[in-house]
Amino acid sequence: MASPPSSGQPRPPPPPPPPARLLLPLLLSLLLSLAPGAWGWARGAPRPPPSSPPLSIMGLMPLTKEVAKGSIGRGVLPAVELAIEQIRNESLLRPYFLDLRLYDTECDNAKGLKAFYDAIKYGPNHLMVFGGVCPSVTSIIAESLQGWNLVQLSFAATTPVLADKKKYPYFFRTVPSDNAVNPAILKLLKHFRWRRVGTLTQDVQRFSEVRNDLTGVLYGEDIEISDTESFSNDPCTSVKKLKGNDVRIILGQFDQNMAAKVFCCAFEESMFGSKYQWIIPGWYEPAWWEQVHVEANSSRCLRRSLLAAMEGYIGVDFEPLSSKQIKTISGKTPQQYEREYNSKRSGVGPSKFHGYAYDGIWVIAKTLQRAMETLHASSRHQRIQDFNYTDHTLGRIILNAMNETNFFGVTGQVVFRNGERMGTIKFTQFQDSREVKVGEYNAVADTLEIINDTIRFQGSEPPKDKTIILEQLRKISLPLYSILSALTILGMIMASAFLFFNIKNRNQKLIKMSSPYMNNLIILGGMLSYASIFLFGLDGSFVSEKTFETLCTVRTWILTVGYTTAFGAMFAKTWRVHAIFKNVKMKKKIIKDQKLLVIVGGMLLIDLCILICWQAVDPLRRTVERYSMEPDPAGRDISIRPLLEHCENTHMTIWLGIVYAYKGLLMLFGCFLAWETRNVSIPALNDSKYIGMSVYNVGIMCIIGAAVSFLTRDQPNVQFCIVALVIIFCSTITLCLVFVPKLITLRTNPDAATQNRRFQFTQNQKKEDSKTSTSVTSVNQASTSRLEGLQSENHRLRMKITELDKDLEEVTMQLQDTPEKTTYIKQNHYQELNDILSLGNFTESTDGGKAILKNHLDQNPQLQWNTTEPSRTCKDPIEDINSPEHIQRRLSLQLPILHHAYLPSIGGVDASCVSPCVSPTASPRHRHVPPSFRVMVSGL
């Protein structure tokens, strides 16, 4: 029920009401005995002189003990008493005195409205309304003040709704609103350079309004709100979402009961400690965590867990009293006032709003004083005590006087901006189970003051507003690059030495017979492959982005051309060995080095076509691949996001598929040729065996290197190491296989090339006479001109043999037709022929001789007469030309003639020799007859 004013009249009974003056003494004594302290001025305040007219002020606040917020009203009454007493002592309103009439609203809308209307109807004409604690009651009354031309001043209503001046134009408050903390929070965020925050709000209108206003303030200052979460009962889901969005600075708006749940959830999610900062309301009850930890325990959150999660949170609230040692409008410092207040309340619980109530009384007094001055200066001669609820002019004068308020009170500088108090906001921090003031924000001056060495963070520095992502380029290790570069340089020096060796000894038979031009191509390809290693190791840590993009193309071209040059040369040499020795019908075919160069050139042409199309249609570009974040190895509060540079394009898979398909087919065919010629052995003359081994080496290592480098594309050091080692290994092994045997042979036995020119080739397919070795000719492919000369000479000798066969046949027929001369021919003629044509050293029984005999018989079928012919069946051995004696005689004539006819072309008897009977060794032009040439003759 409403508390009757000290000099007013109680609620009248049904008409006719009794005069108020008859009940006044009784009501005063009754109310003072039942509710001591309900009126601050009634307890020890000096009585105004009887002739002083009162200036009535309506006081609306909860006073009863049954209401929780009644303690606020009872707690501020001692401060109100002090203010009224000091105002009267200073005669600030002389000849008037301030008359505050209190009405209990009980924090109930109906009872508050009834008390307001009773004061309007039955009380005196109140100049102003002082009070308003409960938001719902205050908002209802404040909305109707304009109709009564009354200005209301609240000392405890902090709800942001009342800041709407369109709806509440006559409402003021000395206490900052809940929204007043938002500029202070903004200043704190800027001070610690926190540019990214998240909000966690309880689904209550009061908190939602603060959150909405804070959102506008932060957006205006370009501070990112990365996540906005709200909850009704269970905050754990919202807390988990905040963590998932990497929110480090959390701005909370919830009551103290929900605060315990929030911090328990934060403990479960590990959202506390040096990486996180919680900023929550600071108006909770003292030691609020002690009151709610029992409920927290019921949710499986122990007290120590709650305190651990709370450690370091920052509370934001208005400052109850100014901390400055400055005299206020009353002539006393805030500290002196506080001591007087504590001594005066005498058992009444303190209220944190008492300073705002004290300053509020002074605001009312200064407003009325200014209004009286305005009336006195006007020509209307109106008195302030003549105010009534329909006096719009005086109401506007009081409203304007309120807006002009500016003085220093116990709560700081008292200034209104659009009816809102520009007060002081304090910051407290929870440290070691207690709240410590660490700073304050002055809204008038817009300054933030952090008390030295009071604010503490659990880390060495304030938490970061987000996980600091350090984008780190994964680069090639400099020591690794240096080591592999050194190996590459050694390989290039070795290749240069081989090139020098190959060029210097190009006229040596050993080098000539292994195609020195093709060997030069192998060296060139190896050196290009070596050079590509330097380019593959250059990344963003060594070169610029533009240069890296250029290197993408250059290194691809160099490696491709180098591979094709080296492998193509080996492939061509392997193909020539296969073409010569796999098909005996091709033994008369000449495969020159020029043809091999054409093969290599064709391969390079295909490469160039692919590379040019690739570059023109879809060139390689520098791309940066970002990987998932990794913790800092040094333990810092940062996360590392690895970056890796790649050379890619839009259709990378297609182009690589084309290149791999072409190279793969070439490699498979090369391995096939190497396998087919695996049993070809050409000691000291040919390097086909080593070329085949090189083909195997390159094929296997390229497959392994391509696969492993693809799997390790996210590890540049491993990938570069594998690619470089594969290139070094393939190039080095290939060059060593091709040149080291030649180098050793040339150093140890320079004549090895001319000592053994025979080789055996075993066919894979079984023939009727399996395990039979066929002697074939080793053709010096490097000496094309010499080979052509030998072929011409061979043709000439064959024609000469044909003529000799005809002559011999005629002689034989003559012998058969003249038997009477047989004895003479047998005894004299054959002896003469033997003396003339026989050679003393032509009796060696070698395989080459047998081959000559066999081939000669095969190529002269006319010598094999039909022994069954009737005319040739004479029993006389002399008359039978097919008898062994005749055959022996014929061979004794043919072979010496054949031998001497061929000798000049192969370095035998000089054509100018006087007699063929002279030994070939006697000729100054005599040379050792190579076995290969003897075999060649046998195939005529």
Swiss-Prot record:
Bilayer topology annotation: Multi-pass membrane protein
Sites of Phosphothreonine modification: 818
Coiled-coil region list: 781-818
Pfam families: 7tm_3, ANF_receptor, GBR2_CC
Cytoplasmic side: 504-521, 572-596, 675-690, 741-940
Localization (cell): Cell membrane; Postsynaptic cell membrane
Disulfide bonds: 107-134, 236-265, 264-301
GO cellular component: cytoplasm; G protein-coupled GABA receptor complex; G protein-coupled receptor heterodimeric complex; neuron projection; plasma membrane; postsynaptic membrane
Residue segments, region Disordered: 762-789
Keyword Phosphoprotein carried by entry: yes
Chief localization: membrane
Bias (Polar residues): 772-786
Ranges in the topological domain labelled Extracellular: 41-482, 543-550, 618-653, 712-719
Keywords: Cell membrane, Coiled coil, Disulfide bond, G-protein coupled receptor, Glycoprotein, Membrane, Phosphoprotein, Postsynaptic cell membrane, Receptor, Signal, Synapse, Transducer, Transmembrane, Transmembrane helix
Signal peptide: 1-40
One function term, GO molecular function aspect: protein heterodimerization activity
Presence of keyword Phosphoprotein: yes
UniProt-listed GO biological process terms: adenylate cyclase-inhibiting G protein-coupled receptor signaling pathway; gamma-aminobutyric acid signaling pathway; synaptic transmission, GABAergic
Residues recorded with modification Phosphoserine: 775, 778, 883, 892, 912, 915, 919, 923
Transmembrane segments: 483-503, 522-542, 551-571, 597-617, 654-674, 691-711, 720-740
Sugar-bearing residue positions: 89, 297, 388, 403, 452
Job description of the protein: Component of a heterodimeric G-protein coupled receptor for GABA, formed by GABBR1 and GABBR2. Within the heterodimeric GABA receptor, only GABBR1 seems to bind agonists, while GABBR2 mediates coupling to G proteins. Ligand binding causes a conformation change that triggers signaling via guanine nucleotide-binding proteins (G proteins) and modulates the activity of down-stream effectors, such as adenylate cyclase.
Entry remark concerning the domains of this protein: Alpha-helical parts of the C-terminal intracellular region mediate heterodimeric interaction with GABBR1.
Similarity remark: Belongs to the G-protein coupled receptor 3 family. GABA-B receptor subfamily.
Subunit structure: Heterodimer of GABBR1 and GABBR2. Homodimers may form, but are inactive. Interacts (via C-terminus) with ATF4 (via leucine zipper domain).
Protein name: Gamma-aminobutyric acid type B receptor subunit 2
Organism, as annotated: Mus musculus (Mouse)
